[in-house]
Amino acid sequence: MPESAFDPTPVTKIWQELGVPGILDVHTHFMPKPVMDKVWAYFDSAGPLIGRPWPITYRTEESQRVRTLREFGVLRFTSLIYAHKPQMAAWLNQWATQFAAQTPDCVHTATFFPEAGAIDYVREAIEAGAGVFKVHIQVGAFSPIDPLLVPVWGLLEDAAVPVVIHCGSGPAPGEFTGPEPIRVLLKQFPRLRLIIAHMGMPEYSDFLDISAQYDEVRLDTTMAFTKFSNEKAPFPESAYPRLVDLGHKILFGSDFPNIPYGYAEAVTALQVLPGVDDNWMRDVLYRNGAALFRVDS
């Protein structure tokens, strides 16, 4: 990993010149070490869910990763955990509760999986202060409209807790990925606060449509627009004007630490988007997330 990837100046210069207090990153990963080690090993193997070489830029010890984000000026971040099998989510939530308690700038994160008892540990997480959930439809290989999740979605809708959901078919499609299951889900739970990870890559236009249709559906920029992603899943030129129109619903995300480039590229890739101005950047990097997660200036 190049030392330049850890230089905060290219990142801090951007948000300072925009006149915002810092960055809110809704898509970062902190997990129990054995889980993170397995995730990194999978990336190293370029497994079928990834489909290409994927070097991890910020493969450092946990406290160093937290310190790196703070040096970049990230005021709030998440510990996006996700279960890929039954009887995993509850103990991940326990770990994330402890992590949030010792890391006050991390939004308390939780997850769930379609299984008996999911409603109970989701309720416990909300009562413990969870401010965001994460589910990964591709890795979890489950349908978001699984009947076991009906009470969970209902609870999350009523509690108005955001859910970062990886439901697009990138970097490789899964049995349950794509926009159609999300459309079905939102017909039943139209007030769900979904944050569509990776702008819904590669079904960008479909998920922009969904966000435009439902007031509480947002998108995060995670890995979108970067050179790495544009090689396989370029954002359609025809959709650029919609980024401006929906700028109030777009949140910055990075996928730190599991990115194959420096953190600064996740920010600079946004600056050069057609039609984007400084006000759009202020909204995406800070103001939209601050409003959603009730962060004081």
Language model features with spans:
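Short, acidic/polar
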Residues: 59-69, 91, 114-125
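Active-site neighborhood of phospho(di)ester-bond hydrolases with catalytic His/Asp-centered motifs
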Residues: 23-26, 78-80, 109-110, 134, ...
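Active-site environment of divalent metal-dependent phosphoester hydrolases
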Residues: 29-34, 84-87, 115-118, 140, ...
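Catalytic pocket-lining loop regions of alpha/beta-barrel enzymes
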Residues: 2-7, 131-132, 142-251
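Mid-to-C-terminal alpha-helical segments outside catalytic/metal-binding sites
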Residues: 1-26, 33-76, 246-251, 260-297
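Active-site-adjacent beta->alpha loops and helix N-cap segments on the catalytic face
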Residues: 88-94, 117-120, 142-152
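Short, well-structured secondary-structure segments
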Residues: 69, 73-88, 95-113, 134
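Conserved, mostly hydrophobic/aromatic
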Residues: 27, 96, 125, 133, ...
